[in-house]
Design a protein with these regions (language model features):
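Cell-envelope/extracellular polymer assembly enzymes that use nucleotide-activated donors
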Residues: 2-4, 38
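Short, well-formed alpha-helical segments that are part of the catalytic scaffolds
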Residues: 12-29
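Short beta-strand/loop segment that forms part of the nucleotide-sugar
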Residues: 21, 31-45, 62
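A conserved acidic beta->alpha catalytic loop
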Residues: 22, 43-51, 92
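Acidic donor-binding/catalytic loop of UDP-sugar-dependent glycosyltransferases
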Residues: 49, 88-104
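Glycine-rich, basic loop-to-helix element that forms the pyrophosphate-binding segment
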Residues: 64-80
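Short aromatic/hydrophobic "clamp" motif used to bind/position activated sugar donors
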Residues: 85
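Conserved donor NDP-sugar-binding/catalytic core segment of glycosyltransferases
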Residues: 97-126
Length: 163
């Protein structure tokens, strides 16, 4: 089994390193199962060191000149050759536990796609209330935050990707 992690990134030099480190550490959950993982950063016409930082962290870098997140995700997915895609925003830090949950969902054989709720690093009363409301609605409606989505590659390609 091969997992392709796609990170759309526009001027993310300040946050991308932590994201890549988190993904590399969390990916051990896949390695424990004998699965492989590739990391693809889709540089979305950045003017900073985003692409160079990604390359230095051993990520494959592809480019999407039109600055739009759906296009960046689709370009990254087109370059992927994994059985499953995981889309992670460049300011997110998914951990090993989340990757282990994804692996369990994949292994169940009952899943084509899934995602995660949101937790913010910095909290405030208003911010916590907004995040809590979003997570509640997400669970009720079976929505996923765009910051972490996974799906079977064949299903993603069949529906034509993001729009």
């Amino acid at each position: 089994m091969k997992i392709s992690v796609v990170i759309p990134a526009f001027n993310e030099e300040k946050l991308l390193g932590a994201t890549l480190g988190s993904i590399q550490a969390g990916g051990a959950a896949f390695a424990d199962l004998g699965w492989t993982m590739e990391i693809i950063v889709c540089d979305n016409h950045s003017t900073d060191a985003t692409a160079a930082l990604a390359r230095a962290a051993a990520a494959r870098v592809v480019s999407e000149p039109v600055n739009q997140i759906a296009r960046a995700r689709n370009t990254g997915a087109a370059a992927a050759d994994g059985d499953w895609l995981i889309f992670v925003d460049a300011d997110s830090r998914p951990g090993r536990e989340l990757f282990a949950e994804v692996a369990a969902a994949i292994q169940s054989g009952r899943c084509l796609a899934g995602g995660s709720t949101v937790r913010m690093d910095q909290s405030s009363l208003l911010g916590d209330a907004g995040t809590g409301l979003w997570n509640l609605i997400s669970r009720m409606m079976k929505w996923s935050a765009g910051s972490f989505i996974f799906c079977q590659t064949a299903a993603f390609r069949k529906v034509g990707g993001f729009n």
